[in-house]
């Protein structure tokens, strides 16, 4: 499935006139395969062995291109660091308050929330974001030992 998503994402970039460099391909592939919502620094550290001449700025520039193409969402939280999420479908995030781990989940009951909000408020709704905060299973196990 990830190979298909990567191929589609590369096609999207090509259609918008973006040149596919080896670094760009690797960064996108990392995002498609990552469920960890990495920071730019995480991506840089994961790929620096394969691309020793690549800088963190290169990663940020590519993430900006991906975001502008609609392939990646930038998730900002209160700690001033951005995390990046490859956009496959609408989903929400459960975030561990101890370790910062982010887990995706989907709740079909919220699919109509934008229409309801638009109806109730008169807003022209563009999107929404839901975050649930708590303690992940791994951190809970550590606390109980």
Swiss-Prot record:
Its main location: cytoplasm. Keywords: Cytoplasm, Disulfide bond, DNA-binding, Manganese, Metal-binding, Oxidation, Repressor, Transcription, Transcription regulation, Zinc. Possibly oxidized on a cysteine residue; the Cys-SOH formed in response to oxidative signaling may rapidly react with a Cys-SH to form a disulfide bond, leading to the loss of metal ion and inactivation of repressor function. Oxidized PerR can be further reduced by thiol reductants and repressor activity restored. The keyword DNA-binding applies. PANTHER family: PEROXIDE-RESPONSIVE REPRESSOR PERR, ZINC UPTAKE REGULATION PROTEIN. Belongs to the Fur family. Hydrogen and organic peroxide sensor. Represses the expression of a regulon of peroxide-inducible genes such as katA, ahpC, ahpF, the heme biosynthesis operon (hemAXCDBL), fur, perR, zosA and mrgA. This is Peroxide operon regulator.
